[in-house]
């Protein structure tokens, strides 16, 4: 059962109970009162679709019996059903009270009294409510005068008792209602029809202020005396300021040609004032005069809140929202709201909107009418009399509100019938001093200039018109960043936002500032976007009504007249908003780049052809609303391929590993282009790239501005940049980078060949992906240990130990590392360094600071085997092959002697190694601290010695280790002093002299 049917069934029971309890029945008016007293609400006529109580009860023939009386009234009695027959019989047996009978008889006699009311000379005025009822009755269909009583009683449930309003006959009623009722004589008799008002026939537009534009009401002539000396007043003749008016009174014309000019002007002013008084009085007597002044003030207040105009269909709703009360035009005597607004033309002005096909209501005082030239004067020729020279001059000189006020007493609809339009215009064109065409051109020019100035004025100077946001610069490979996953389409198509002080906090600050700025109503209205600016690709802002925040958006497409689809560049999603909620974006809010980064999960592809809904849902649950750790892999077609890891628990959870375990994805060792972003990539369409060519070179060479890693507790740390004091190394950075890239292509191949020949290096070869256990870390996933990324290798721009105390390597070390390991630094850097930089003799061991303790001990143990000389020879040869091409490009002239000394030491060390094959004991014996101090102070101590053992011969390195930024990378004492980057003295000076 619907809600309407439930209300109707409940209403039937309530009306039956009310009528059964009354023995003599109730009139429709009494039924309304009794229902209000019993229920507390009025009858739900509008909800059920009825116009009157009589129409409601006629639709209930099984509940209500309509009994007409001889006096024209209607009595409603209940029709009992099976359950209420007993109650009805008991009520019928009740005795009738004499007091009730006398009161009812007195009431009926007072209503239907045939006594003629006393009235004075002024005829009675038909109340507005009665006039509204007559309009409602005749709006359906015309009614014969002989059937008027029956039709009125059928419609409203009561007879039309005109005598209680002061009328003596129905003829007087029709005469008083002649402005709304027209009587036509037909063969069947007098036919009453509803007269169309002048406001419906032709739209009236009047200047605000002194002009009252109520239609002139036809009064009875000769039926009664008004008590005013002027009995016949007509305004059919034109009246001018500069000419003596024609006499409008019913008396003989008095010649005015012999009077002086002063008396003529004073007489003209008096007549003009008298005419204005007549018009204002007639306007107050008209339909608008029946409206309460307080109510008119309220209506004007509501309309004044909309300077751009209020649609007439929304006037009643806005009135109820502002004053919490309903505005009923019928209770005021008007058929609808259009007629009410037309009657209030002294405070309101109506214009027709061709775009919305609706009427717009304006406050006449806030926005006065602008003249539209002779064309509008022809259309509204009743505004101004065109055959007077002074009026034409007023229009041509100053088409403003003041000029309209000066001609306020000229010919209007009061005295200008439509049939005289052509005659008036012909008179105007016959005047030789009136120029029409130049006036039209001038007005059109003013209109175009006005529209242009308004268009420029509506756009704030700091509003964004054709500007685009910039994207964030690309991240470096293997960089660890904190991210929020903002919007997910699939694991291969989602958007992330970096969580850092430079991004997320700046975005929050900007949104707070935008909310503070645009929440001001004046600012919000100032930055409203016109219709012609709402185009795809335009950058603007919008407020979401749910959370009251303002967001930067880019218009994607226009859905209709009221809605557009927008892209949120800071969050990645697409939504639908209203055109009216769009605002211009201030230029100061475009400095922050678009924060949403299009991403794809690295090294995964769907198990099926497309991602399933379960896979997408599982990926959404993994992301959640928490910060994640992202490991940058690479960019493909501008899309960031990134590993996502959840470090909130004790164990790190890699998302691609979870998707593979659940069977949603397949892990592969390469990234495929995202199909979703290939079809539609809003950041590429609507934003500009912010990467410079110089920055791209540094990124490709593996020299990031900042690198990140995880410590032993799983926290995200930031590796600090090294202090670069040598300006020469920075100047040679780009010149050496090209050669290093060339060497990086051949270097790994040579290293691989040399390592394959040595059987003891076979354990360092990468494993086959098929042999990898699925329960362990996925294949190729970077090992997030507390190990630095190969920054502690030897620097060519080394300085003496005293000058280098506490300093790390220069940028050339970064470049050399990148040339060795290529793009995937974090995968093979440890293996390559183990292959190239470990020597077999205990004297010549050079430990890297990032090398783990277990591997250092393993290498140290292998150096004491009898096969050490062979390994030493092969490794020295490998080192010579690797390092000579890289060192043939000197970085500075001061390093040439040192490089020559280094080459000589390599040759001597090779010769000494060949000569020392017969003395394995000397090789197996580790170098003592005393020998190292006596031979070379710059030599590196053995891996097994501690820094304390060298306190007598070398400077104390404790402060250097404490101040070094890489001390956390050492896992044992074997690499404690390797942070001080000195040239490795492979052969002691004393042995070289003996040789």
Curated annotation (Swiss-Prot):
Keyword Repeat appears in the UniProt entry: yes
Listed PROSITE patterns: HTH_OST, TUDOR
Modified residues (Phosphoserine): 946
One GO biological process term: transposable element silencing by piRNA-mediated DNA methylation
Paired cysteines (S-S): none
Entry's localization field: Cytoplasm
GO annotation, cellular component aspect: chromatoid body; pi-body; synapse
Annotated HTH OST-type domain residues: 7-80, 122-197, 291-365
Tudor domain boundaries: 533-592
Stretches with biased composition (Polar residues): 911-925
Pfam families listed in its UniProt record: OST-HTH, TUDOR
Keywords attached to this entry: Cytoplasm, Developmental protein, Differentiation, Phosphoprotein, Repeat, Spermatogenesis
Superkingdom of the organism of origin: Eukaryota
Disordered: annotated span: 747-781, 857-892, 911-960
Function recorded in the entry: Required during spermiogenesis to participate in the repression transposable elements and prevent their mobilization, which is essential for the germline integrity. Probably acts via the piRNA metabolic process, which mediates the repression of transposable elements during meiosis by forming complexes composed of piRNAs and Piwi proteins and govern the methylation and subsequent repression of transposons. Required for chromatoid body (CB) assembly.
Family indicated by similarity: Belongs to the TDRD5 family.
Protein name (database record): Tudor domain-containing protein 5
Gene behind the chain: Tdrd5
